[in-house]
């Protein structure tokens, strides 16, 4: 897996990964396995940016991916540190540069399918840019389709989450799950960015629909 050199990005995750699902007894006496839900607030340079409802895992990757795909940053190189508190309720992201005042202004904007809220003003975001052409090979699609059909662990247990795969040079290098397709994509992008992968050479394969906001996320990722 080819990587590019990046400035050191420090991650302090005191929360880690918690139980991904739980078994509940229904009124009729049967049991159902449901995914765990977790709420967290993402701050950028001490300013509130997003509130997310997600599965309780990969919070640093979710935060980094969200900033990339929403246009707050153009590269993971801009991030100096990501810190998650022990309860996982707050994710602090510190950039290597000040955050423009208007971008830090609090403004609640509904975002995607799990009650996520964007708290930052949607101005001064990174503009959309042309995406380099990537020749998609038929065998890549077959490999991704087979992996999606097989299902990831949380999906197999609950049948109630979305998945997103990252493919690089024909190999699946990351596979992420979450309650919402946007979160799953953000986690996948965050994983790839932390690994130093050239995102312009990667393929994202998602279980969710591909509406304009998801396409925009993929473009901003690279």
Language model region names:
Residues 2-163, 167-168, 174:
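Intrinsically disordered, low-complexity regions enriched in acidic/Ser/Thr/Pro/Gln residues
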Residues 82-99, 199-222:
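Cysteine/selenocysteine-centered motifs that mediate thiol-based redox chemistry or coordinate metal-sulfur cofactors
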Residues 57-58, 67-68, 180-182, 190-194, ...:
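Short, solvent-exposed amphipathic alpha-helical segments in soluble enzyme
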Residues 58, 137-140, 144, 181-184, ...:
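General structural feature for long, well-ordered alpha-helical segments within catalytic domains
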Residues 149, 189-193, 215:
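Generic structural signal for well-ordered alpha-helical scaffold segments
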Residues 154-208:
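Glycine- and Gly-Pro-enriched alpha-helical subdomains that act as flexible
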